[in-house]
Amino acid sequence: MEAERRHRALYKGTTPPWKETYRKRCVERLKSNRSKLLDKFRQVGERIHGGVGGSFLVQEVMEEEWKVMQFENGGFPSMWKKDAFSQDPDELATLEEIKQELLLEEKAMVEEFENILQFEEQCFDSVVELSTGDQIVCPVCNRNYLTVTSCFIVCQCGVYINTQSQGMSIEKLHSLLESNLTAHAYHCNKLPVFSVATELGGAASLFMSCQECDAMVVIL
């Protein structure tokens, strides 16, 4: 009770001095939990609405950040225990305002994730298009089927890559193409291109590159 009185005295008749600090901390925590939010979003698939109040992380973020401020300032009551937090209309309105801002921030992040997942599907489809049964279309020329053995990969367009040390197979090559396309799609919404380049030692390697984000990855 005494803690609550001290807490209310902090901002009686004025804008709560903790409001901006709490708001900024909540926004920063929400953004720092980006990967966690993406994992939660993946788990629910196409169901846009998450947990409490249609949110994935907002309630959790607000609770965690309030606990930090409560630890730093003994004048803050326990927000989430029954009858522990003040029912002052101004105080509740402040919290609701912060919550709505966080919900909008989370919504923007979810929309971004939707675009990422949609692009990942497009990339997966492009890999599927490269594969027909036990065959893979050459990602360099996009016309001919590759001949894949444990020792080499070859295409009529001129692609020849020695894979003797890697023990290559159709399944392994498909997995490499899919995983690299998916990883690229996480941070860029443009489809990359594939090429073969000869290194200093004379060995040929398969590269995946993107002009949009300047990414370049050695696939083989």
From Swiss-Prot:
One of its GO terms (molecular function) is zinc ion binding. It holds the Pfam family RPA_interact_N. One of its GO terms (cellular component) is nucleus. Signal peptide: none annotated. InterPro entries: RIP (IPR028156), RPA_interact_C_dom (IPR028159), RPA_interact_N_dom (IPR028158). Keywords: Metal-binding, Nucleus, Zinc, Zinc-finger. A zinc finger (RIP-type) spans 138-213. Residues 1-45 are annotated as: Interaction with importin beta. GO terms for biological process: protein import into nucleus. Residues 49-165 are annotated as: Interaction with RPA1. Transmembrane segments: none annotated. It is found in: Nucleus. Mediates the import of RPA complex into the nucleus, via its interaction with importin beta. Interacts directly with the RPA1 subunit of RPA complex. Interacts with importin beta, but not with importin alpha. Forms a complex with the RPA complex and importin beta, which is dissociated by Ran-GTP. PANTHER family: RPA-INTERACTING PROTEIN (PTHR31742:SF1), RPA-INTERACTING PROTEIN RPAIN (PTHR31742). This is RPA-interacting protein B. It comes from Xenopus laevis.
